[in-house]
Amino acid sequence: MAAFSEMGVMPEIAQAVEEMDWLLPTDIQAESIPLILGGGDVLMAAETGSGKTGAFSIPVIQIVYETLKDQMEGKKGKATIKTGGAVLNKWQMNPYDRGSAFAIGSDGLCCQSREVKEWHGCRATRGVTKGKYYYEVSCHDQGLCRVGWSTMQASLDLGTDKFGFGFGGTGKKSHNKQFDSYGEEFTMHDTIGCYLDIDKGQIKFSKNGKDLGLAFEFPPHIRNQALFAACVLKNAELKFNFGEEDFKFPPKDGYIGLCKAPDGNVVKSQHTGNAQVVQTQNLPNAPKALIVEPSRELAEQTLNNVKQFKKYIDNPKLRELLIIGGVAARDQLSVLEQGVDIVVGTPGRLDDLVSTGKLNLSQVRFLVLDEADGLLLQGYSDFINRIHSQIPQITSDGKRLQVIVCSATLHSFDVKKLSEKIMHFPTWVDLKGEDSVPETVHHVVVIVNPKTDKLWERLGKNHIRTDEVHAKDNTLPGANTPEMWSEAIKILKGEYTVRAIKEHKMDQAIIFCRTKIDCDNMEQYFIQQGGGPDRKGHQFSCVCLHGDRKPQERKQNLERFKRGDVRFLICTDVAARGIDIHGVPYVINVTLPDEKQNYVHRIGRVGRAERMGLAISLVAKEKEKVWYHVCSSRGKGCYNTRLKEEGGCTIWYNEMQLLGEIEEHLNCTISQVEPDIKVPVDDFDGKVTYGQKRALGGGLYKGHVDILAPTVQELAALEKEAQTSFLHLGYLPNQLFRTF
């Protein structure tokens, strides 16, 4: 409890954590919890089972609770934006004179719009009528923006009418929809100075202190109106300085900061906000935190963690809701109407509720994307961008949206690209590093070569049912076509899977198949062997886990496998991602994954907690034709066996190439074993019993200590000598002075 409390975790959560036997935080928790509690965006990567869920759930629960507590007690917090006339007494950007997607920070100076298709603008709370004035704008990112001056009559789209004058990052000045080249381009980290001489009717700009020359001369009718600092943004962030802080590049020639304008020359904005107060009341269907998971199982797992962590939180109690498909939406809507604080869900149902207005995102403080690489792999990039654009970047109480991204690896280009788009200067917490295979995992490859192993010809019809990719092809022995070899590979892989189970007397394993139909076919083949879901204790007892199974069935199947009621879990990558399954002694890859990172995810499920594990991958020597659905139905009812480039839904799958990429990625050569799948005794580890701890673990460590012992003794002697010399030097000055 003390260990978590030292990180700033509230006692109620620390007590719940202690009851879960979490005496010390894991590495990812120790790094991430303080960062999130401190208000930052965090990108975290660590192995599955390392405590990532706790690393984001604990601080999210605490901050949501503190926010609700403050609201209940009537506190507005240090960062609350003032309303009504109070806003107009300060030089800042006006929250009541801005576009719908334009966010203003608690200081009134930091501004942001994350709308990527439309421009959204804003004006300052006060304008000037006489004199020479200056303000600065700092660019915080690489988005598009225009800054300058406008009257109260001007459009918020600065520079598109005769009442506004703007200077844009593309090096163009704009007035009345006329865009002319001026100065030079500017972008992130640049500071733009905006000069206004009302008496002469002149406007000019500077970049990082460099005067860019006269930009506009405005007509007399403009001089009779108050001019306000203004900007317009598209997916950009700026910070204004009206002179209350020291300017980076102080103006010369008699220009002064706007905040020093004499009262007689200052006019307050007509937009006072008296009828437009930013909504602060709590809506029942507006949660404070949204956690997005790639699968139902992972969402349920995360929700259970949230329930455990909030166990002792009271006054106010936190209300959580699981939003997933396959469950009656009516039940979820009734809970939403009663009020929720934390929502955990999967993209499909979340998208439905958000698009219909049933789930309101206006008060979200936290957006958590768990297993982000999995979400992107499933094609949810547009969904993520869509919901992010609907969440205010700064809430009504002045707090900034925090985005937390968890991924099995941060070395994915897509994850990096996403973080640059939706996160605000995120801190990277990468405790995983480059992919590597744990020492407790033996992984081997079995080459499936139908040209040398003719077993498939002798089986007749007594083989695994295949995926019907070759339903219209001639695959009979003797055809000698790529289609025949492909069908033979599918048959042999079913036989090799059964052979591996018998050879190693597997009592528990995860079997990864590439598609949902492959999973179903493997389950059916195990039933033909006398096993299946209802044969508890049988050598081939199994359950199936993939997206087409009903949620309740998936949940029950997972629990049955965890309890040991069945020996084998047959699943796809997507269904198994992030599921908390420990200590499985065997994994069989019926087909290599097309993403090399997924190979490490799969085999990383064995050999945990110092227990040895064996991962067997069946790799086709020839190319295999497989389903690759690009149709709108995502494979349901699709039998288009033409290749993708011909408008169909199949591809030729080259596992030998994938194997090469995996070996290059891991910087190692994976051992190959014969089709009899007998794994030779390792010269280093000796005879290994998979699922049990390494017999030589302690001995190896002891040997390592013996090797280091002489060096450590030498180091101790040197340390003693250094300390003694230091003590002698301490007395030396006094002795020297005595001699004189």
UniProtKB/Swiss-Prot annotation:
Similarity comment: family membership: Belongs to the DEAD box helicase family. DDX1 subfamily.
GO cellular component: cytoplasm; cytosol; mitochondrion; nucleus; tRNA-splicing ligase complex
Keyword annotations: Activator, ATP-binding, Cytoplasm, DNA-binding, Exonuclease, Helicase, Hydrolase, Mitochondrion, mRNA processing, Nuclease, Nucleotide-binding, Nucleus, RNA-binding, Transcription, Transcription regulation, tRNA processing
GO biological process, one term: tRNA splicing, via endonucleolytic cleavage and ligation
Superkingdom, taxonomy of origin: Eukaryota
Tissue: Detected in embryonic retina, brain, heart and liver (at protein level). Detected in embryonic retina, brain, heart, kidney and liver.
Purpose of the protein: Acts as an ATP-dependent RNA helicase, able to unwind both RNA-RNA and RNA-DNA duplexes. Possesses 5' single-stranded RNA overhang nuclease activity. Acts as a positive regulator of transcription. May be involved in 3'-end cleavage and polyadenylation of pre-mRNAs. Binds DNA and RNA. Component of the tRNA-splicing ligase complex required to facilitate the enzymatic turnover of catalytic subunit RTCB. Binds (via helicase ATP-binding domain) on both short and long poly(I:C) dsRNA.
Protein name: ATP-dependent RNA helicase DDX1
Organism annotation: Gallus gallus (Chicken)
Location of this chain's protein in the cell: Nucleus; Cytoplasm; Cytoplasmic granule; Cytoplasm, Cytosol
PROSITE patterns named in the record: B302_SPRY, HELICASE_ATP_BIND_1, HELICASE_CTER, Q_MOTIF
Pfam families: DEAD, Helicase_C, SPRY
Entry EC number(s): 3.6.4.13
